Amino acid sequence: MNNPIQKWHDVVKLRDYNTLTEIIHDDAIFYSAVVYTPQKGKDITLKYLIAASEVFNSSSFKYDKEMIGENSASLEFSLTIDDTDINGIDLITWNNDGLITEFKVFIRPLQGVNLIHKMMQGMLESFKNVS
């Protein structure tokens, strides 16, 4: 089974959105920490992941722990935004071809969730204005 996690780390580190496009399945589902409904499809998943990459673009962002299975991984992260310490988990699932089929994000504490919600909303709105 192809494991896309190293490519994912490269995407995060280098903000390499071409590689991101290559590792997301056409029918991927993104589960946001701040949006109730699952976001279905490659295009919307890419928008959320790129927006998150821009919002989280901070020298303090890092993955602290990883648990990697046969076709899924749990990546614990931490960062600081506006003096708010935030941590969370990315749950990533992929298929036999190494394409990410599901991406779930969990964030804490509530102040961090609210801050990221506001920032993500602004970033996603800016994408709409560009399109």
Model-based region annotation:
Residues 2-23:
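Short acidic-aromatic low-complexity motifs
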Residues 18, 25-69:
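A solvent-exposed, acidic/Ser-Thr-rich amphipathic alpha-helical stretch
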Residues 21-24, 28-30, 116, 120-124:
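Conserved short hydrophobic patches within well-ordered secondary structure
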Residues 53-131:
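A beta-strand edge to alpha-helix "cap/lid" segment located at domain peripheries
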